[in-house]
Amino acid sequence: MGSIINIPGLPDGEFSNYEQVYLKMSRAFSHLQKEHWGIHCVCSVSRDSPNGSTFSETLRQAWMRLVVEYPGLSMVPVGLQKKYPRLDEKVVLLIQHWRVDALGTCMLLDRLFEILGQSTVPSTQPDQVQPNQPTPSFESAAGASKTEDADLQAYARDYIDSFHQRAVNADGLPYRGDATTPPSTTAHWDLDFSVDSTNAIKDACRHHKISVTAAIHTALARTVFSYLTETECQAGYTTVMAVNMRPYLPPPYNSKKHACQTFVASITPTVPYHSGFVESARSLTHEYRSWWSADFMRSLWWIYEYHLAKLSAPRPANAAPMKPPSGVTLSSLGVVDRNLRGGYGPNLRVDKFRFGVSMMTRQTILYAWTFKDRLTLSLNYNDAYYSDLMAREVMSRVASHLEKGLEVELNTV
């Protein structure tokens, strides 16, 4: 699929700074005809076709209706080359990250399946479909100020300076190849825990007054420590943590009617090397719940203006070569069933769910979610830099640290 998206009448200059950050990352490898951070979501479904219609026919009409309801899904792909023949009843959504985030993807699919689950083929007539209002950018939805306020600008500069220093300098996994090795194919390695194991993790976290995400985060930190030297470990482990900002937005932007937009921020917590498992997880749980502030929301215009400027600035000609970052970003989708219900009347149910993104750098992303009471950990990476053996070993160590830290026995399915 072509990686460049052309929206008639909407040049790059009409994207907000926040949206341009995601757009810039998406297009970073366009010279190789590859897209970075392209979202893919795969759902296996079981369905009884209404009125004898085929699944593909009904799906096509349901998608047309969804596009009318969510105008942000409309696009003209440039360089569309691949076709995916239907082998089984799986629904695959490919979409750009600057257009939607992980939870928004779940919300869109939930609405698509809701349409599909109806007893009659859904109407696509414009006069019978009520489109949602266009969704503004994150900055606008949050009510951020564009005023040249010295305090807001100072807050924004401090936030971005700290973010870049902590995110860029963080150590990560050892990768194969060197700084000139081009990316290849996106891959993933998943661990699907049993229902009993998932419940054991949740019970242990509840007992220790920590979140499941914080426990996974701590296990990930200890896994990365296991690949570093003793000296490298002393700085602790800092990773970029994706944060869902939808609960912080005012109505109506915190609703499913505004699913087709990216509402995500990033924080950079540090896990100290010498702290205990539960101690680290409690500290992370507290940071997850306390980092947000009204000043952050009010400063968003300036935060992403400075962020975009730093990302776009050329490196000084005399600067020493920078080691490509190879950190592991953590992103928790939480309980997917809250946004993708899984059951849609007697005609349709979603049996399996998987989410991921295309990765073109040496960085990797660990996604965590529960669906139908099972916890899944999915490591997304590029196979030019990591073998499947390496990915499997990383995930095995994460699971092992979860077992030891929470004192539970875990089984995968």
UniProtKB/Swiss-Prot annotation:
Keyword line: Transcription, Transcription regulation
Give start-end positions of Polar residues composition bias: 123-138
Region of interest: Disordered: 123-145
- Induction cue: Expression is positively regulated by the azaterrilone A cluster-specific transcription factor tazR.
So where does this one cross the membrane? Answer: none
From the UniProt annotation, give the residues forming the signal peptide.
Answer: none
Q: In which pathway does it act?
A: Secondary metabolite biosynthesis
PANTHER family, per database record: CHROMOSOME 7, WHOLE GENOME SHOTGUN SEQUENCE-RELATED, CONDENSATION DOMAIN-CONTAINING PROTEIN
Q: What is the role of the protein in this entry?
A: Part of the gene cluster that mediates the biosynthesis of azaterrilone A and other azaphilones, a class of fungal metabolites characterized by a highly oxygenated pyrano-quinone bicyclic core and exhibiting a broad range of bioactivities. The first step of the pathway begins with the non-reducing polyketide synthase tazA that assembles one acetyl-CoA starter unit, five malonyl-CoA units, and catalyzes a series of Claisen condensations, methylation, PT-mediated cyclization, and finally releases the first hexaketide precursor through the R-domain.
Q: What is this protein called?
A: Azaphilone biosynthesis cluster protein M
| Biological source species | Aspergillus terreus (strain NIH 2624 / FGSC A1156)
